[in-house]
Amino acid sequence: MDVEQKKPLIESSDRNLPDFKKSVKLKYVKLGYHYLITHGMYLFLSPLVLVIAAQISTFSVTDLRSLWEHLQYNLISVVVCSMLLVFLMTIYFMTRPRPVYLVNFSCFKPDESRKCTKKIFMDRSKLTGSFTEENLEFQRKILQRSGLGESTYLPEAVLNVPPNPCMKEARKEAETVMFGAIDELLAKTNVNPKDIGILIVNCSLFNPTPSLSAMVVNHYKLRGNILSYNLGGMGCSAGLISIDLAKHLLHSIPNTYAMVISMENITLNWYFGNDRSKLVSNCLFRMGGAAILLSNKRWDRRRSKYELVDTVRTHKGADDKCFGCITQEEDSASKIGVTLSKELMAVAGDALKTNITTLGPLVLPTSEQLLFFATLVGRKLFKMKIKPYIPDFKLAFEHFCIHAGGRAVLDELEKNLKLTEWHMEPSRMTLYRFGNTSSSSLWYELAYSEAKGRIKKGDRIWQIAFGSGFKCNSSVWRAVRSVNPKKEKNPWMDEIHEFPVEVPKVSTI
């Protein structure tokens, strides 16, 4: 057993997220309330309609007869009011956004032959002859503390001896992941591929020609007028960007389906150099992907799992430090890799702070909003020396799907948001079982909650992810129905009885 090193791999000040609740800018709170007011018409009209209905229900027959006689003598007023009512109702039905339902989703589970234990990872890394002994030791220590288990997956091109990363193998990995997830999704939903009107594929680091979305169109012979999008270079939060894009398209195009595929490609993005800031990605990222089917057809509600409540996107790219904290570049030996800067955790904390400050007014109960806002105004405007109030997001959500980017980030989010081990379990178990699957990790986490039988009708789910750019994005879902795990097919079902497991702080290899 190795002796634990005295000095941490990353300095504490760089490793920990800042206490983002202690520094909140009023403009982000204002933005959140702007979103609330924009969608607040329905909130204010609903009680008014209920009051009018309650008042009418108290009328006696004599009152109704008297009202009818009064209307007969004011026919012009009745006609004008009726026309105005019809006009307002028409405007309401024409302008209200169409609901966006998540019919179902699927997560790809690779074959057993692609499993990669920590020992296999270290053995293959050594056999490449690319890494110095010091950097092999560095990777071993990162891997020991990563939170990954012994059953994550890597593509064949990386596991082969010697490795053979090439365009052919990268396409093979992409097709395996995408088509595997889509085949399962179509089988679950019984949707004809020709009925899909919108296709969005996001993959940050692999963008071939023809595009990944074109590969899907060709393989499934999708219709010629499909709206096809291929998002690249947008990092681990790209999955929620795809959901947000699909939402806006579904709000403007009636009666159609949108299919979203979120994945990352490992084959051509394995780093074979000795720059330590690029080696961390090798230790964390693993093979995986997800396919999601969305619908704006109102009759699909009865068979859908979730309804999209809201999305909030935050982009910090205007700040140079944020923009450059995750960069794909060449090292001194001209080998390409993804650099993770020391400022990453601080940047992530700032983006997260902005995102949840904007999201808060949309989801938090009124009591929490008032306490949070009053404390904020007191501290910012009146310079009062009072302790900042940390809203309890557990009052707004029953389930949390936090991007499984790494153990340190999950630890800090658990502490800052005051979440319990139960709330963090889907994220930690996803990181342990599948590793960092980039933008698709959120869906493995939701699948975990479903497999555990936790999703009940009316439950609210918060998905939050962050990635290069720097971006932090959130989506909020409400369960349309309870999910029966016995009827589910997802990558956890055949082994869910083994989880949760205790993940050691430092594992042995």
From Swiss-Prot:
InterPro entries: 3-ktacl-CoA_syn, ACP_syn_III_C, FAE1_typ3_polyketide_synth, Thiolase-like. Its main location: membrane. It is an enzyme of class 2 (transferase). The active site is at C236, H315, H399, H403, N436. Residues 92-381 form the FAE domain. It comes from the Eukaryota. This is 3-ketoacyl-CoA synthase 11. It comes from Arabidopsis thaliana. The gene is KCS11.
